[in-house]
């Protein structure tokens, strides 16, 4: 080859190289942000698994890069995995794994031909802020008090719902409280997107939050949610729970110990400010499930509040006495289930608000007996628990609370006598049977989480009652076995809730770059503020579509709409909030370095 030819060849190569560099530089700058790249919008822990999903078949795109946004340098390169699919969706997904990226910082994923992700962070204590916001959500749900700007910022509001003129509904009459009797039943939390209060759901929620304190006391002690009680000698979580317990205690009939099922208006209020509500409020008939959920949560609270007698003198004794009486009433009235339709045929006014009904109270009896046994040490409660102990573990939800009793026995099993230890060991085996089966769903799951592999995972409240409570079970399995796979599985479920999912939403209001703006939540809808109250877990995809709203898809994991009218997919509720608060706090505590 002649020298001139060599020179020309060299120039050509140089031009091509420059062109390539220019093109790649331009392509980086011009890459659009792609909604197809789904990840935990809060971020990642440095030493834990890191996974993102491309919500499409990878096609011709085989590589991805990660850019450090501080230095603008590419710090990681990887290959897209094989495509995944599910049995219920025609859509495919592709997994990106970058767990080796362990340096704290802010980053962005880039895939030529697809686009770039939103920026994300890698840092320690990743879930601390969302955990605090989730617990703070209960403060915003308080009633019978002004929500002050000092503690609530722009979401402050005036005093509403004193509940000091509550009427005994005809279904709840007793010799000493005839229909129309006025009682005071103030304080407590608004249950969900509505303005009513329900003992079944409150008792369950209190139990979940108290369990968090029992399981992770050091973490809870350092949680400061900036509420009026912050700075006293009591953890903020207990101060918050006490606000609701104060109300719950007023729901017990002093004559016989039974507990009213709920405090409610006949019909749901409109989307109006709480201070503008005018409907008469009633307490409705006593029920066995309300009495047992009350008994369980009061027994649990009684043993915990002994540690904060300075701020709550005599509180523990009061709660334990109330718990015993409620359990006795339930034992005498085991079939007193709440059946709203039957009540409405007999009494006026008809009640059309949340029923929180049940088909059996056996699981409530087990939970209540478990808590009373732990608190009192009395064998009569152990005997009851032994007789009705579940034969399989089910992650707890308000309507299936046997799992609460299982976790209580697991938590305290080491302090029991031989009989108690035997039952505790059985409960451990049931839990591990469940988690060993559930963790297998992580394999080839379309969004790389045990939750969400099957269509049955999606229903009313699934972000809590399928994803969060399963995550809690995984964390128990990790504590019991030390097997890292369970902790990883729990983190994967959290990744799903916080954005690595089929809709691309982070399902916590006020967090992430795409979160619900129009929840079915009267407090948020009526406050004349654009952003909803932050820190609230939204129910999530629900193919049942009970609200008859217009949904963007019929695919189960996409049946979600950010619409104020969508109570079936876009509401919050204290029971869901409680499970998520536990899950987020426990996960953050377990991953602390």
Residue ranges and their predicted role:
Residues 389-395:
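Solenoid-like repeat scaffolds
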Residues 229, 233:
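Acidic, glycine-anchored loop motifs typical of Ca2+
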Residues 37-114, 124, 136, 140-207, ...:
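Aromatic (Trp/Tyr) and acidic
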Residues 21-33:
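Bacterial Sec-dependent signal peptides at the C-terminal "C-region" and cleavage site
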Residues 236-258:
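Carboxylate/His-rich catalytic cores and anion/metal-binding grooves
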Residues 2-14:
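Bacterial N-terminal signal peptides that target proteins for export
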Residues 13-21:
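Sec-dependent N-terminal signal peptides
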Residues 252-261, 334-342, 377, 440-444:
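Proline-centered turn/helix-capping motifs that create local helix->coil transitions or kinks
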């Amino acid at each position: 080859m002649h020298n001139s030819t060599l020179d020309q060849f060299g120039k050509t190569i140089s031009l091509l190289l420059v062109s390539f560099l220019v093109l790649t530089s331009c392509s980086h700058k011009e890459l659009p942000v792609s909604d197809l790249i789904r990840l935990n919008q809060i971020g990642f822990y440095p030493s834990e698994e890191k996974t993102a999903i491309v919500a499409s078949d990878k096609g011709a795109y085989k590589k991805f890069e990660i850019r450090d946004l501080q230095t603008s340098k590419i710090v990681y390169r990887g290959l897209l995995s094989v495509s995944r699919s599910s049995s219920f969706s025609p859509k495919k997904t592709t997994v990106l794994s970058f767990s080796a990226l362990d340096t704290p910082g802010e980053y962005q994923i880039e895939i030529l031909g697809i686009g770039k992700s939103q920026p994300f962070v890698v840092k320690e204590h990743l879930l601390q802020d969302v955990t605090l916001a989730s617990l703070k959500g209960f403060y915003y749900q308080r009633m019978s008090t002004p929500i002050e700007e000092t503690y609530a910022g722009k979401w402050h509001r005036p005093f509403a719902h004193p509940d000091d003129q509550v009427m005994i509904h005809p279904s709840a009459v007793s010799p000493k409280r005839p229909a129309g009797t006025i009682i005071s039943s103030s304080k407590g939390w608004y249950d969900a997107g509505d303005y009513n209060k329900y003992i079944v759901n409150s008792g369950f929620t209190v139990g979940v939050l108290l369990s968090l304190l029992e399981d992770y006391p050091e973490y809870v002690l350092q949680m400061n949610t900036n509420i009026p009680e912050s700075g006293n000698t009591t953890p903020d979580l207990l101060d918050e729970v006490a606000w609701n317990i104060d109300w719950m205690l007023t729901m017990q009939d002093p004559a016989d110990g039974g507990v009213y099922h709920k405090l409610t208006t006949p019909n749901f209020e409109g989307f109006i400010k709480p201070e503008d509500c005018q409907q008469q409020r009633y307490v409705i008939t006593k029920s066995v499930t309300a009495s047992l959920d009350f008994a369980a949560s009061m027994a649990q609270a009684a043993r915990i509040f002994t540690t904060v007698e300075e701020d709550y003198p005599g509180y523990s004794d009061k709660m334990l006495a109330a718990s015993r009486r409620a359990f006795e009433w339930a034992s005498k009235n085991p079939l007193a289930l709440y059946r709203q339709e039957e009540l409405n045929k007999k009494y006026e006014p008809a009640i059309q608000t949340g029923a929180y009904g049940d088909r059996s109270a056996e699981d409530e009896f087990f939970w209540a007996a478990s808590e009373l046994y732990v608190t009192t040490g009395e064998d009569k409660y152990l005997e009851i628990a032994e007789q009705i102990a579940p034969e399989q573990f089910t992650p707890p939800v308000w309507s299936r609370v046997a799992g609460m009793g299982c976790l209580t026995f697991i938590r305290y099993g080491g302090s029991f006598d031989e009989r108690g230890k035997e039952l505790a060991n059985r409960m451990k085996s049931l839990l591990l049977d469940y988690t060993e089966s559930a963790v297998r769903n992580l394999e080839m799951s379309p969004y790389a989480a045990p939750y969400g592999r099957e269509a049955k995972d999606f229903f009313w409240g699934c972000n809590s009652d399928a994803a969060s409570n399963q995550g809690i079970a995984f964390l128990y399995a990790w504590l019991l076995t030390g097997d890292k796979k369970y902790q990883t599985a729990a983190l994967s479920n959290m990744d799903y809730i916080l954005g690595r999912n089929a809709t691309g939403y982070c399902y916590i209001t006020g967090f992430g770059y795409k979160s619900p703006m129009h929840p079915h939540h009267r407090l948020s809808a009526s406050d004349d503020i654009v952003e909803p109250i932050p820190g609230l877990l939204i129910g999530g995809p629900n193919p049942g579509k009970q609200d008859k709203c217009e949904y963007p898809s019929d695919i189960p994991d996409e049946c979600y709409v950010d619409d104020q009218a969508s109570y079936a997919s876009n509401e919050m509720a204290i029971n869901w909030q409680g499970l998520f608060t536990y899950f987020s706090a426990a996960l953050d505590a377990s991953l602390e370095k």
